[in-house]
């Protein structure tokens, strides 16, 4: 019987192995020399990276992918096991095969919330009696395997966890790192270290945050998001409160009112010196190469911190890393040196190129608060480098999120000179409420003079070539596939 994730040689098979959350786990397991296989309908540089470390990757999601394991009838389970929804279901013995595979060699099937119950590969795994785990079960087991630092929050998780990982690398601690974005420093979204520390981004989107119990937990902020799972902010708070109870030490940003009201962190940080946080900053300045600030610890001056990122939100993310470093006993000079050399994660205000006098930036922002903060950072960049305009190209992400935050999106683009809205990236959702990008554009236009709606990505490049001018900063916003058109704008096709 397999009730918990097993790291003692039992194979892992990931359905949807190319996803950003799944691939990081698969990479770590493969680098630990465990048998790893998986499937994804799209081949990508992510799946190619997994193949380079020994993972077997199928480019379809079919029942036949599982024939590589060839179980016997005795290998089937009749017990309660976690399924993709995080619940348990009884799996009956249904498969007959001729093989010598022992119960101890049954593959562990790993799914994410994105895998539907009618997925043929998932259905086959159930019928075969294979133990099925949610990806969060694997991460939770890894967290217990290390001295773990879990970074949670509605916004800033990837940058904060990457900063912490980079800081520990700079301090010679050789951490294992799993984040929700790609970082050039470790050529992807995960790295296997030989040290005792694991830095992990822990996700609240589907409620699985409650499975994690790191030694040090961080909460960057809390807002209502993921309306496909949460109906109210209170529901989000309850999820984070369970996480708080499971952390040995909680570090949290008390600039967030929800955190101040509902949580009791042992260590606090804030951008406001008047909040009397354990860690704060003073005399923040912004330059073309990033941000500078004085860092203070419990009223004592620690030193100057420089980060190559713009925006108050990134100062806050860096301050979280400082708090973690000091909690682990690192000298501030080591912390500051590590933070100073971090250049950011991919799709987090990522500089994609420069063409015909136009700078192209890609950012993952898809929540109103993220859009607002990213545009504030763009405005800072414009003021420092004397760009002419900030042109925001926005692809709304998910019908449920767009409908829930329509009014908030309407007022999130104040720092843009021009706004272009595309159609909504569904992320697999059904458009029950008949929400459209046109509605988003109309809402923004009630507060903004220059708003355009251009639904199709196929012709968006041509449209932008007419809108963009030398001196513009073109900022692509969204968690979907909007950034795929950037290369054609940087390297226009010759007619």
Swiss-Prot record:
Highest taxon of source: Bacteria
Entry's EC annotation: 6.3.2.8
Binding site for ATP: 153-159
Pathway this chain belongs to: Cell wall biogenesis; peptidoglycan biosynthesis
Main location per the UniProt record: cytoplasm
Keyword Transferase carried by entry: no
A GO CC annotation given for this chain: cytoplasm
GO biological process, one term: cell division
Keyword terms, alphabetized: ATP-binding, Cell cycle, Cell division, Cell shape, Cell wall biogenesis/degradation, Cytoplasm, Ligase, Nucleotide-binding, Peptidoglycan synthesis
GO molecular function: ATP binding; UDP-N-acetylmuramate-L-alanine ligase activity
The protein's role, per its UniProt record: Cell wall formation.
Protein family: Belongs to the MurCDEF family.
Protein name as catalogued: UDP-N-acetylmuramate--L-alanine ligase
């Amino acid at each position: 019987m397999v009730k918990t994730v097993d790291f003692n040689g039992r194979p892992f098979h990931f359905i949807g192995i190319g996803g950003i959350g799944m691939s990081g786990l698969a990479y770590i397991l493969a680098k630990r020399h465990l048998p790893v296989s998986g499937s994804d309908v799209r081949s990508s540089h992510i799946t190619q990276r997994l193949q380079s470390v020994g993972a077997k990757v199928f480019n379809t999601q079919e029942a036949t992918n599982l024939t590589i394991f060839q179980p016997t009838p005795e290998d089937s389970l009749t017990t309660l096991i976690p399924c993709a929804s995080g619940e348990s279901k009884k799996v009956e013995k249904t498969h007959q095969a001729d093989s010598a595979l022992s119960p101890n060699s049954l593959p562990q099937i790993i799914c994410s919330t994105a895998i539907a119950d009618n997925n043929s590969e998932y259905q086959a795994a159930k019928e075969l009696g294979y133990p099925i785990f949610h990806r969060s079960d694997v991460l939770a087991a890894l967290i217990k395997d290390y001295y773990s630092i879990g970074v949670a929050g509605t916004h800033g998780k990837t940058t904060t966890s990457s900063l912490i990982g980079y800081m520990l690398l700079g301090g010679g601690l050789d951490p294992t790192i799993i984040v929700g974005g790609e970082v050039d420093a470790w050529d992807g979204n995960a790295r296997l270290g030989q040290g005792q520390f694991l830095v992990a981004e822990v996700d609240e989107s589907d409620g699985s945050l409650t499975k994690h119990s790191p030694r040090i937990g961080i909460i960057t902020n809390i807002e209502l998001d993921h309306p496909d799972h949460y109906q109210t902010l209170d529901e989000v708070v309850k999820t984070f409160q369970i996480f708080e109870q499971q952390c040995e030490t909680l570090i949290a940003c008390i600039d967030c009112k929800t955190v101040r009201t509902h949580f009791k962190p042992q260590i606090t940080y804030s951008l406001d010196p008047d909040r009397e946080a354990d860690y704060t900053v003073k005399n923040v300045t912004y330059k073309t190469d990033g941000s500078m600030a004085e860092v203070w610890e419990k009223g004592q001056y620690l030193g100057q911190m420089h980060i190559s990122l713009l925006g108050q939100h990134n100062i806050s993310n860096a301050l979280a890393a400082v708090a973690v470093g000091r909690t682990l006993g690192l000298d501030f000079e080591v912390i500051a040196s590590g933070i100073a050399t971090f250049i950011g994660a991919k799709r987090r205000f990522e500089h994609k190129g420069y063409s015909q006098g136009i700078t192209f930036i890609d950012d993952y922002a898809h929540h109103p608060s993220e859009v607002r903060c990213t545009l504030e950072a763009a405005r800072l960049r414009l003021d420092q480098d004397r760009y002419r305009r900030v042109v925001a190209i926005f692809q709304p992400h998910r019908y449920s999120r767009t409908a829930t935050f329509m009014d908030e999106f309407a007022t999130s683009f104040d720092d843009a000179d021009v706004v272009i809205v595309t159609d909504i990236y569904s992320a697999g959702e059904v458009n029950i409420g008949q929400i459209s990008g046109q509605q988003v554009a109309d809402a923004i236009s009630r507060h903004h003079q220059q708003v355009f709606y251009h639904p199709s990505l196929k012709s968006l490049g041509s449209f932008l070539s007419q809108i963009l001018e030398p001196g513009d900063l073109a900022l692509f916003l969204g968690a979907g596939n909007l950034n795929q058109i950037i290369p054609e704008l940087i390297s226009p096709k010759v007619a």
